[in-house]
From Swiss-Prot:
Cofactor entry: [2Fe-2S] cluster; Fe cation
Any one GO biological process: cholesterol catabolic process
Name recorded for this polypeptide: 3-ketosteroid-9-alpha-monooxygenase, oxygenase component
Gene: kshA
Molecular function terms from GO: 2 iron, 2 sulfur cluster binding; 3-ketosteroid 9-alpha-monooxygenase activity; iron ion binding
Pfam families (alphabetical): KshA_C, Rieske
Length: 390
């Protein structure tokens, strides 16, 4: 894709910058992808998930173990997600062929025997942090032991709430759009009405981390989690692979420190559509009831939802761009994209510059000064408007 623009009448010799954008990759990222919360799949029924260019079925066996198979029956193409769980197998609604969690056909009630080649694709799963993950690898390799989803300390104890969880289906955009946010400090000010004060990135191996300290903007009440200008929010957000981020947050307000853990994750539906999921748990404060703590987690998740809706509005209307024109304060976009590329190439084609440790801290001096001036000007205009005579 190339967007041409007319040459300006300027006297300088600078050439017009053209936007370059190749087609979105047709393969899906290698790595762990979260499909949702365990509790949403543990009702004894089959569940349909559109992902990785096909349809999957999630079902629990008699021991409660969740299994994920390709949803289309290898017999005549029936949709297993519309079938019935029978014992440890999922039965196709078309002809009652039954498939266990390993993808093997276990029974055909009307047939004398099961064809020995009757096997479908079973996806490698992981149950952790109250969530279900599947491993995707176009080469068919199993997940390496050192590439996994970490256990979240404290989850499942009485000290923390349970997940408040939400999802959005994003059409017309590739997953890379959301991953770019890892390095995009300025968009937090203009899109999410946060005021970043400190911003740093560290990439290494299969992880990419964003460190940010921010406050709210005095001139904007957005309904997000950044509204209080007197509360500092400290965030350490790490992608573990291409699609699953854990964000550890601390917020100081009214003499108390509130600890929140935010999950930001997604899985691809196609190469230009994905499902974005996010959830929050909050550490319970002394003297705060479980109901109030759960309400805090829900409020935080709702604020995150509004923030992502702001992002989606941008994604729906922006052009994809492979050669972004950057300033010094824009962050290491190209380095992040090199890191991200490792998940879209064969393992043997991963290069050192995709995985070696990289650190970059943005000098926020100029940005903070400019934003403080903008906020002050906006507050002055608001004051003039409130005192104006009708």
């Amino acid at each position: 894709m190339s967007i041409d623009t007319a040459r300006s009448g300027s006297d300088d010799d600078v050439e017009i910058r053209e936007i370059q954008a190749a087609a979105a990759p047709t393969r899906f990222a290698r790595g762990w992808h979260c499909l949702g919360l365990l509790r949403d799949f543990q009702d004894g029924k089959p569940h349909s998930i559109e992902a990785f260019g096909t349809k999957l079925v999630v079902f629990a066996d008699s021991k409660g173990q969740l299994n994920v198979l390709d949803a289309y029956c290898r017999h005549m193409g029936g949709d297993l997600s519309r079938g019935e769980v029978k014992g440890d197998s999922i039965a196709c609604p078309f002809h009652d062929w039954r498939w266990n969690g390993k993808g093997k056909c276990t029974d055909i009630p009307y047939a004398r025997r099961v064809p020995p080649i009757a096997k479908t694709r079973a996806w490698t799963t992981l149950e952790r942090n109250g969530q279900l993950y599947v491993w995707n690898d176009p080469q068919g390799n199993p997940p390496p032991e050192d590439v996994t989803i970490p256990e979240i300390a404290g989850y499942g104890t009485d000290e923390w709430t349970d997940w408040s969880w939400k999802s959005l289906r994003i059409k017309g955009s590739h997953c890379r759009e959301i991953v770019d946010n890892v390095v995009d400090m300025a968009h937090f000010f203009y899109i999410h009405y946060s005021f970043p004060r400190y911003f740093k990135n560290v990439f290494e191996g299969h992880t990419a981390t964003q460190y940010m300290h921010s406050t709210g903007r005095e001139d904007v009440i957005s309904g997000t989690n950044y509204d209080d200008p007197n509360a500092e929010l400290r965030s350490e957000a790490t992608y573990f692979g291409p699609s699953y981020m854990i964000d550890w947050l601390e917020s100081d307000a009214n003499g108390q420190t509130i600890e929140t853990i935010l999950i930001n994750c997604h899985y691809p539906v196609s190469n230009n559509e994905f499902v974005l999921q996010y959830g929050a748990i909050v550490k319970k404060l002394p003297g705060v009831s479980d109901e109030i703590a759960a309400g805090m987690a829900e409020q935080f998740a709702e604020g995150v939802q509004l923030g992502f809706e702001q992002d989606v509005e941008i994604w729906k209307n922006k052009a994809p761009i492979d050669n972004p024109l950057l300033s010094e304060e824009d962050g290491p976009v190209y380095q992040l994209r090199r890191w991200y590329q490792q998940f879209y190439v064969d393992v043997e084609d991963i290069t050192e510059d995709m995985t070696k440790r990289f650190e970059f801290e943005i000098d926020t001096t100029r940005a903070v000064a400019s934003w403080q001036k903008e906020v002050a000007e906006n507050l002055a205009k608001q004051a003039e408007g409130s005192t104006a005579t009708p």
